[in-house]
Amino acid sequence: MKILALAVAFQGLALVCCTDTTDNYNNFTHNTSTFYRIADYDKRFWSVKLPPVNWTTCGNEDHPWITIHYDEIDKLVDDKLASWDKGPVPDREEFRNSILRQARCDRPHY
């Protein structure tokens, strides 16, 4: 099940709020690696495994905040653009912003 996420820029961080179940929230730890499915320009999704991340609550115990450092997003953008094979390479900043706007996350993989 795909779970909608909200990407918010704040002091060098991208905060992604994942709607999730209480059970998953209780099992989510600082050592949990998470897979994110990020929308590409042509609306296909590609999965990216991020390293363990920190989280805090956002007012509801069912909704953990997952913190992704911008340097992780920048690495994903650079890797994707370096292997771009779908015509002209898009503007880096525009492509990066589209990834942040269209972020989606799956349930954490344990």
UniProtKB/Swiss-Prot annotation:
Present with 952 molecules/cell in log phase SD medium. One of its GO terms (cellular component) is endoplasmic reticulum. This is Uncharacterized protein YEL068C.
